[in-house]
């Protein structure tokens, strides 16, 4: 149900926060950020950026800048007049590589 989805989103957001702490604004971080943000937007979250900022432990302005960078570097497409966007092949590949690597969650 909805709680399950929300829990997954919160987990992903927290994981993004850990990546940011450990690696800075790295490829896995931007991919994770884009993916979590897209899920939030798809859920119809009214304020995905503040929610994301809370999970990551940074200010919304900072997270907004990171999302801009994620779009610029090709992790997330821009959809005019709509929150969210589509994840790109690059994002999928980076996340897959991360999850399958030693510092992933297995």
Spans of model-derived segments:
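DNA-contacting interfaces and partner/effector-binding or oligomerization modules
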Residues: 1-7
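Short, Lys/Arg-enriched anionic-surface-contact patches
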Residues: 16-36
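Short, charged amphipathic recognition helices of the HTH superfamily
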Residues: 40-54, 74
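Alpha-helical DNA-recognition elements
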Residues: 69, 73
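Short Lys/Arg-enriched helix C-cap and helix-to-coil transition segments
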Residues: 77-93
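Short, amphipathic alpha-helical interaction segments positioned at domain boundaries
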Residues: 93-106
């Amino acid at each position: 149900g909805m709680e399950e989805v929300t829990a997954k989103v919160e987990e992903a957001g927290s994981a993004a926060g850990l990546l940011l702490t450990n690696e800075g604004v790295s490829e896995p971080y931007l991919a994770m950020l884009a993916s979590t943000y897209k899920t939030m937007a798809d859920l119809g979250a009214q304020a995905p950026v503040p929610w994301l900022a809370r999970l990551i432990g940074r200010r919304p302005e900072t997270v907004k800048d990171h999302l801009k960078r994620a779009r610029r570097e090709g992790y997330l497409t821009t959809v005019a007049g709509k929150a969210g966007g589509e994840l790109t092949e690059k994002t999928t590949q980076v996340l897959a590589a991360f999850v399958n690597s030693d510092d992933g969650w297995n």
